């Protein structure tokens, strides 16, 4: 496995192991009603939480939460820590990379340009909501500027910009 992917897509492998462990714990527990919602990204987790309705049964919530996470596409904008190749593209240390659910979506030198290209690769005709969670290394001004550009490019989508405060990732993007 490419060490570069240990940040980003490589995290999905770790989360799959966590899901397996959670399901195993559920199988071993007889006196509690445990439901595992198999989220693999932070945006999926947020969508699952928003889908939860306290008045509904556990089974209804499980169905709604699981359906909700199926609609989420996740993107992450970060930087390369070393020279490498990802998806047949040459990456140099310090390059800005846009990673999606299934691989590299964009690479370049400018954070906002790579973020825009990443989002463009994620949005389709069914997209309704674009959420941008900017990290500790992206200014509020840059995040708001990105949000405005995305609103102009996709007027039929709702665009939200929120401070996520995450390290390493300039922004994490959710498209639903």
PLM feature spans:
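Active-site loops and adjacent core secondary-structure elements that bind or stabilize anionic groups
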Residues: 12, 130, 156-158, 162-166, ...
